[in-house]
């Protein structure tokens, strides 16, 4: 969603190091940190995400980006939330935005079903985007800027 050029690939855990990018819209800008994905037991040191969890402590908000092609998006969201909570319960008190990404890869009906599942689970609006086609990104950025201000 920013001008950063992180590696993009069709497999999990493409991000191996935090990537910072700047989002600019009109006269506003903000820094977005793309942190490597968390796996179950990351708070215990498993996977790459653990060593980057400290970066999340400094963030104003958390954007949960979930791959819409995941079979169980609810489990994916809950795994991330659980790991953040196990690392530091205060992190889960931050502003949250939930995003389903890669929406160019599956049909609209399946996206709608998964979006409803996550909205029921999180009680939050879920944004659907494709960072490849750009679909939905502008709406997401508008929401991020509203929360920031």
List where the protein language model places each region:
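Conserved C-terminal guanine-recognition region of P-loop GTPase G domains, centered on the G4
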Residues: 25-27, 50-128, 138, 144-147
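N-terminal, positively charged regions that mediate nucleic acid binding
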Residues: 134
């Amino acid at each position: 969603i920013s001008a950063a050029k992180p590696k993009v690939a069709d497999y999990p855990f493409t991000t191996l190091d935090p990537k910072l990018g700047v989002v600019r819209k009109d006269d506003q800008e903000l820094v977005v940190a793309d942190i490597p994905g968390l796996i179950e037991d990351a708070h215990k040191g498993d996977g790459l995400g653990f060593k980057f969890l400290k970066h999340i402590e400094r963030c104003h908000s958390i954007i949960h980006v979930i791959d819409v092609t995941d079979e169980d998006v609810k489990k994916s969201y809950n795994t991330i939330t659980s790991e953040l909570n196990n690392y530091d319960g205060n992190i889960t008190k931050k502003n949250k935005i939930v995003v389903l990404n890669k929406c160019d890869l599956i049909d609209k009906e399946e996206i709608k079903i998964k979006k409803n599942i996550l909205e029921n689970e999180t009680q939050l609006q879920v944004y659907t985007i494709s960072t490849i086609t750009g679909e939905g990104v502008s709406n997401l950025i508008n929401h991020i800027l509203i929360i920031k201000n």
